[in-house]
Amino acid sequence: MVANEFKEEFRMAEQYDVVVIGGGPAGNAMASGLKAQGKTVLIVEADLWGGTCPNRGCDPKKILLSAVEARQAAQHLQGQGLIGAPKIDWPALMAHKRGYTDGINDGTLNGLKGQDIATLHGQAHFQSDNQLAVGDRVVSATDYVVATGQRPAILPITGHEYFKTSTDFLDLDQMPKRVTFVGGGYVGFELATIANAAGADVHVIHHNDRPLKAFDADLVKDLMAAMTADGITFDLNTDVQAITKTATGLQLTADNFELTTDLVISSAGRIPNADQLGLANVGVTFDRHGIQVNDHLQTANPHIYAIGDVSDTPVPKLTPVAGFEARYLVGELTHPGAAIKYPVVPTQVFAAPKLVQVGISAAAATEHPDEYRVNILDMTKWFTYYRFGAQQAQAKVVVAKASGQVVDATLLSDVADEMINYFTLLIEKNVTLPDLQRLVLAYPTPASDLQYLY
């Protein structure tokens, strides 16, 4: 083979139908779906194969929470059949977590290769409309899909270099005695729950008096009361201005506020991984909310799409949403059609107890009392919760008066994360109480309570 023929063969090998940038849940689903449709696909990942969720996000967090939940269950039944509550052995729990996460990178990569999907590891950077550089390689495609996700935001304050992130927390070898979370979103609440159960003195600092602003204010207050009773301190209306290293730890300062701690986690939101891609070179725009896309998930460049957490869409940034968008876009790139239409999306805070919501929100419903009724229920003494000594179980369920259909549910309980999926089905499929009563559900289970919540 002469040199020119070799160059031509190499160039052709670098041409694909679709290049997917990002090897997380969205990108992997995208690549697998396109490959199944007969497309030639290259997937590029700059960090860990598998992405945030299984490596340093929802999955390892839930593994750590498993011990927290078991400990809490034993505590609730003290004097009611159990004697002595277990303590969390953090190094052993972390080893359990790593037993799962350590295999994600290689397992994901091998899974892609097993599907005969081409892979590249490195930072992708658009050079022009038809050239994407990955290290010293240059590839091109008919279409590109950006699925690079998000990363934790770091507040730009004096001493910001002392901030650690959720990534660091989920891989701690030892739990410090004092842990502080700056930011009262779901990440701060969830990791605070874990740290507190593991024996740390925990503070959650938030800049106003409304943490978890996307959730029902009343049930957020109930959750905070429960977490406070467990020993977590909430410092509201506090804007941290500086972090200083001292002989006794890390000192956080704000107006009329000082706190010394051992570990400071920035839990003040997440930002899109869009700034290293060279998007300006191809006419694609983004801001702190993500890459701008239309209702076909298409950017300003007609051959570049964005899905998952990196895209600016009107839905929560969640792994199942990313998967939904990937499935939609596989269809759009193979058989173009209708704009994306999202189903109802449940959101949750895996604290103790758990707070979940799906639908239009009770607050929105109260603005239209002629259209909706809001059922507010204290379920704490119901059998489902009494049997394991639950401290509280609350619900707000919104029903449309005209149709009798549930349009929103917000729940606070130890089994709320299971209940919310039932409500998601009820809302999405427009199930009325008579519809539900025509079913026979297993009893006694949380699902058998549904008919009493309409």
Feature map (PLM): residue ranges:
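Flexible, glycine-rich terminal cap/loop adjacent to redox cofactors
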Residues: 21-29, 33-47, 59, 63-70, ...
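Glycine-rich dinucleotide-binding loop and its adjacent helix/turn
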Residues: 58, 146-201, 205, 280-282, ...
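Glycine-rich flavin
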Residues: 6, 13-16, 32-39, 44-175, ...
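Conserved beta-strand elements of the Class I
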Residues: 19, 42, 179-180, 305
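FAD-site-proximal beta/loop scaffold in flavoenzymes
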Residues: 161-176, 258-332
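Short hydrophobic core segments
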Residues: 19-21, 124, 139-149, 181-182, ...
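Hydrophobic "anchor" residues
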Residues: 60, 132, 272, 299, ...
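A Rossmann-like FAD-binding core segment of flavoenzymes
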Residues: 84, 125-133, 139, 200-295
